[in-house]
From Swiss-Prot:
Family (UniProt): Belongs to the UPF0180 family.
Organism: Clostridium acetobutylicum (strain ATCC 824 / DSM 792 / JCM 1419 / IAM 19013 / LMG 5710 / NBRC 13948 / NRRL B-527 / VKM B-1787 / 2291 / W)
One Pfam short name: UPF0180
Stored InterPro entries: UPF0180
Name the UniProt record assigns to this protein: UPF0180 protein CA_C1486
Length: 86
């Protein structure tokens, strides 16, 4: 079972992923505050990943990040599958 971290505020996506068989943990605060915890997940879903004007983020993690902004629950699930099947 894949373990997914989901940013707080995305409870509809978290509930959907649980119903699809994922182990889901809600993450409070922003991604930078949870960076150390991120490595314990197979993927992390965020509402709007914090990037600078060049499109890069300051948080370093090996865990795939899925930006759920503008995506349906199904699209988020598909992105998780794509990013974790490598």
């Amino acid at each position: 079972m894949k373990k997914i971290g989901v940013e707080s505020g995305l409870s509809a996506i978290a509930d959907y992923l649980k119903n699809e068989g994922y182990s889901v943990e809600l993450l409070g605060g922003n991604l930078e505050n949870n960076a150390a915890k991120c490595d314990s997940f197979d993927a992390v879903v965020t509402a709007d990943y914090n990037t600078n004007m060049m499109g890069f983020c300051n948080t370093s993690t090996k865990t795939p990040i899925v930006n759920a902004s503008g995506l349906t629950r199904e699209e988020v699930k598909n992105m998780i599958e794509q990013k974790t099947s490598r």
